[in-house]
């Protein structure tokens, strides 16, 4: 059983001595993905109630489990018959494991005192060794981590001070600074002359380098981060989590140092960043105005131009409308019939009964002298009934220039599929023209396609492109390697090889 001597470093499961190989295999399958048992034993679980009496809780196989997904260690008891977890206790910080008896081990649980009563003392011995070795290793690592912050977090930049007057005392000064106990011993002895401001010369080749705000343990300090650096990180798509991540932030810090430091990065950023933004911001505004400015003009043009054409087309446009509107009749009388209905449209301007008689004579004389005289009396009565029933289709028949204009406007409305107007039939060419103008505005507002300027791509050259390339390489490295191994050094008490798949 040499495998149980160094369980924390093993990646294989350690079964119980009292179980068969098949039972141990079943136990291993109950552990869960990426979980390993470092020691296993058949036990009874006891808990001390308020009366300080041990009470049995359950029986099963106890396992010291290394849970890689949770990055922690647990004591877990499984029922191998039902294949379920009966109890668990995480090994918290300062966990103390006692063994008052070789077969009876106790420790403080989350809610009460807990004890494991082992069925086999050999198993109890191996189990105890696995737990104590793990606790000891964690203790040593935590002490190392506690001592580490005492040292310098950042390498101190050395400055060469050329002054011959203090070169003879440089070695002594370093001893005084680095060895405190020797300094205390020499206090009683004769004191050497201390340096004064006059003895210290001015430094040569001194350059002030801005502080990046990066700490090797906590990453970048987001509260005190330089605004220009933050702008650079935003342009490269670097998140706050990446700036806080120890490894990723170190990659970014190394990049800044290799580039020449914070000031060099900021100067490069100032030289490159300003030019691109203006064009990208100035580009979008121009396109929108053209559509808006071009949209309104067309409708008015139609409104002004519409009246002139109708008069010239009046003689030619008047004949066509009648045939399509009356497909059943080809004889000349129908056109006059259509001519006479117009009198009703004039009703709004004058009395209902008065308008019919006057218009017929005038229209008959202007458009077709022979046909109008015979039919005037009969057609008079039919139009009124026809108007209420078929007002939408029979109304566009007025003759003359106004009639032609009205016919043209109405034909245009039919072609544009807006004839289902709820408003009353227009009584004059002016009203019809106004309707056409309104309809034209509605159609115009949705007819034009919008002109869109392609967005200017973000700059990927210079300092921004270089940093983005570094971050892409970092991302590929993270995804290509195992996720568990990448995050190993983030644990406070674990080594790089602690967590495994």
Curated annotation (Swiss-Prot):
UniProt KW Metal-binding keyword: no
Function: Regulates actin polymerization by stimulating the actin-nucleating activity of the Arp2/3 complex. Involved in various processes, such as mitosis and cytokinesis, via its role in the regulation of actin polymerization. Together with CDC42, involved in the extension and maintenance of the formation of thin, actin-rich surface projections called filopodia. In addition to its role in the cytoplasm, also plays a role in the nucleus by regulating gene transcription, probably by promoting nuclear actin polymerization.
Impact when changing residue 253 to E: No effect on phosphorylation. Protein preferentially localized in cytoplasm
In-chain residues carrying the UniProt-annotated modification N-acetylserine: 2
Annotated protein name in UniProt: Actin nucleation-promoting factor WASL
Record Pfam families: PBD, WH1, WH2
Compositional bias (Pro residues): 273-387
Domain WH2 stretches: 401-418, 429-446
PROSITE patterns reported in the protein's UniProt record: CRIB, WH1, WH2
Domain CRIB: 200-213
Subunit structure: Binds actin and the Arp2/3 complex. Interacts with CDC42. Interacts with FCHSD1. Interacts with FCHSD2. Binds to SH3 domains of GRB2. Interacts with the C-terminal SH3 domain of DNMBP. Interacts with SNX9. Interacts with the WW domains of PRPF40A/FBP11. Interacts with PTK2/FAK1. Interacts with PACSIN1, PACSIN2 and PACSIN3. Interacts with NOSTRIN. Binds to TNK2. Interacts with SNX33. Interacts with NONO (via second RRM domain); the interaction is direct. Component of a multiprotein complex with NONO and SFPQ; associates with the complex via direct interaction with NONO.
Entries under InterPro entries matching the protein: CRIB_dom, CRIB_dom_sf, PH-like_dom_sf, WAS_C, WASPfam_EVH1, WH1/EVH1_dom, WH2_dom
Sites bearing Omega-N-methylarginine, chain numbering: 304
GO cellular component entries: actin cap; cytoplasm; cytoplasmic vesicle; cytosol; glutamatergic synapse; lamellipodium; nucleus
Regions of compositional bias (Polar residues) in chain numbering: 442-453
CDD domains cross-referenced by the UniProt entry: CRIB, EVH1_WASP-like, WH2_hN-WASP_r2_like, WH2_N-WASP_r1
Molecular function terms, GO-annotated: actin binding
Main location: cytoplasm
Modification Phosphotyrosine occurs at: 253
Domain (WH1) ranges: 31-138
Stored PANTHER family: ACTIN NUCLEATION-PROMOTING FACTOR WASL (PTHR11202:SF36), SPROUTY-RELATED, EVH1 DOMAIN-CONTAINING PROTEIN FAMILY MEMBER (PTHR11202)
Cellular location(s): Cytoplasm, Cytoskeleton; Nucleus; Cytoplasm
Region entry Disordered, spans: 135-158, 263-403, 442-501
Modified residues (Phosphoserine): 239, 480-481
Keywords, alphabetical: Acetylation, Actin-binding, Cell cycle, Cell division, Cytoplasm, Cytoskeleton, Methylation, Mitosis, Nucleus, Phosphoprotein, Repeat, Transcription, Transcription regulation
Encoding gene (name): Wasl
Posttranslational modification: Phosphorylation at Ser-239, Tyr-253, Ser-480 and Ser-481 enhances actin polymerization activity.
């Amino acid at each position: 059983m040499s495998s149980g001597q160094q369980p924390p470093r093993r990646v294989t499961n350690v079964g119980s001595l009292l179980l068969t190989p098949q039972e141990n295999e079943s136990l291993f399958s109950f552990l869960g993905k990426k979980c390993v048992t470092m020691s296993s034993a058949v036990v009874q679980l006891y808990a001390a109630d308020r009366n300080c009496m041990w009470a049995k809780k359950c029986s099963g196989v106890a396992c010291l489990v290394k849970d890689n997904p949770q990055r922690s260690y647990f004591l877990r008891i499984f029922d191998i018959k039902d294949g379920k977890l009966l109890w668990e206790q995480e090994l918290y910080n300062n966990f103390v494991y006692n063994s008052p008896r070789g077969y009876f081990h106790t420790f403080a649980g989350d809610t009460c005192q807990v004890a494991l009563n082992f069925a086999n003392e050999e198993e109890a011995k191996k189990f105890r060794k696995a737990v104590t070795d793990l606790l000891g290793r964690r203790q040593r690592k935590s002490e190392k981590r506690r001592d580490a912050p005492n040292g310098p977090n950042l390498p101190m930049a050395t400055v060469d001070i050329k002054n011959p007057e203090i070169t003879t005392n440089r070695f002594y000064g370093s001893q005084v600074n680095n060895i405190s106990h020797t300094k205390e011993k020499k206090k009683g002895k004769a004191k050497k002359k201390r340096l004064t401001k006059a003895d210290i010369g001015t430094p040569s080749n001194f350059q002030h380098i801005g502080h990046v705000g990066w700490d090797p343990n906590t990453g970048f300090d987001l509260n005190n981060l330089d605004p220009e650096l933050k702008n650079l990180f935003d342009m490269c798509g670097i998140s706050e989590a990446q700036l806080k991540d120890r490894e990723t932030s170190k990659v970014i810090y190394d990049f800044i140092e290799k580039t020449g430091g914070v000031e060099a990065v900021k100067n490069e950023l100032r030289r490159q960043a300003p030019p691109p933004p203006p064009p990208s911001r100035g580009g979008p505004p121009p396109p929108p105005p053209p559509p808006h400015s071009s949209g309104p003009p067309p409708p008015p043009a139609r409104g002004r131009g519409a009246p002139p054409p109708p008069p010239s087309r009046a003689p030619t446009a008047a004949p066509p409308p009648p045939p399509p509107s009356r497909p059943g009749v080809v004889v000349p009388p129908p056109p006059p019939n259509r001519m006479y209905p117009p009198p009703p449209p004039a009703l709004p301007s004058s009395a209902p009964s008065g308008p019919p008689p006057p218009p017929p004579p005038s229209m008959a004389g202007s458009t077709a002298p022979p046909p109008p005289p015979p039919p005037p009396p009969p057609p008079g009565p039919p139009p009124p009934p026809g108007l209420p029933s078929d007002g939408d289709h029979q109304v566009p028949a007025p003759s003359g220039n106004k009639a032609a204009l009205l016919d043209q406007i109405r034909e245009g409305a039919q072609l544009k599929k807006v004839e289902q107007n709820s408003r009353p039939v227009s009584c004059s060419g002016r009203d019809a023209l106004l309707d056409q103008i309104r309809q034209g505005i509605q159609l115009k507002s949705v007819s034009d396609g919008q002109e869109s300027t392609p967005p200017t791509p973000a700059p990927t050259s210079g300092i921004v492109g270089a940093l983005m390339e570094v971050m892409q390489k970092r991302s590929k490295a993270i995804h290509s390697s195992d996720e568990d191994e990448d995050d190993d050094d983030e644990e406070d008490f674990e080594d790089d090889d602690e967590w495994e798949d």
